[in-house]
Amino acid sequence: MNDTSVVPAADAPAKIEPENSLSIQADVLRMMMEGAWSNPRDLEKVKANCFKELEIVPGLAARAYYSIPYNDKGGGKSLVEGPSIKAAMTLARNWHNCFNDGRVVDEDKSNYYVNGIFFDLEANLTTIRQIKVSKFYKPKGSQGVVPRNADMMYLAVQAGISKAVRNAILASLPDWLVQAYFNKAKQLVINPPKEQGKETESIQVRVQKGKAIICKEFKVTADEMEAYITNNADCYEDDASLLTHLLGLFNGLKDGQINVDQVFRPKNAEHPEMPREKK
């Protein structure tokens, strides 16, 4: 339930009206909670259903996590990984007796503030996570920032809401469930279930395909891809870990966790303020 309203004209100033209240009436909420209490979740069934989806839905495991590079101030390189937005929604759906919501709650001259909300009906637990979305961006080749138009602002806010909702969901669910799902997804990327009549491609072939899809989708050259892999070689133990990283990197780029210049062209990287959790 994402209650946002954006001026539709692409050249009009972006305006999104804040909404602070949950879009659900108290009597309806009470009925939902009573239903949850009379049908409590089965944790083993929750885990089994999450795993089953990964096993029977082709490609779901590859979309279940992100993996992005991180360079610390001392020059060290590592990978930051976690469940994707799609993974969070899958976990919430199978958790049952809950709902999530996302909305714009405030703004200032530079940013919109969006909340992701997760409510566990059975536990009577509400978790809220906030993300800040900049009203400005830095065009390529520009020395300064310019305001986002209405269409761009709408997309940026929706991305921010999705991330805030994901953060609220993952903060609410048990760590053991989230970690087990994350690990299972990576295992299935390396060793996918055999499809009837089809032979599983080698990891090396799938690595090459992973490179190719990133190059095609994000206009990365083959030389840029190889330079990136070489420069971050310490982050991969073997071809299997490289494969899981490439698929997670695709998700990270797609979901806006990081931009393509930051990954493949660090010397020329522009760093627009991306949606992030407000501390």
What is the predicted function of each stretch?
Residues 272-279:
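Short acidic DE-rich linear segments
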Residues 1-272:
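Polyanion-binding surfaces on beta-sheet-dominated domains and ring/shell assemblies
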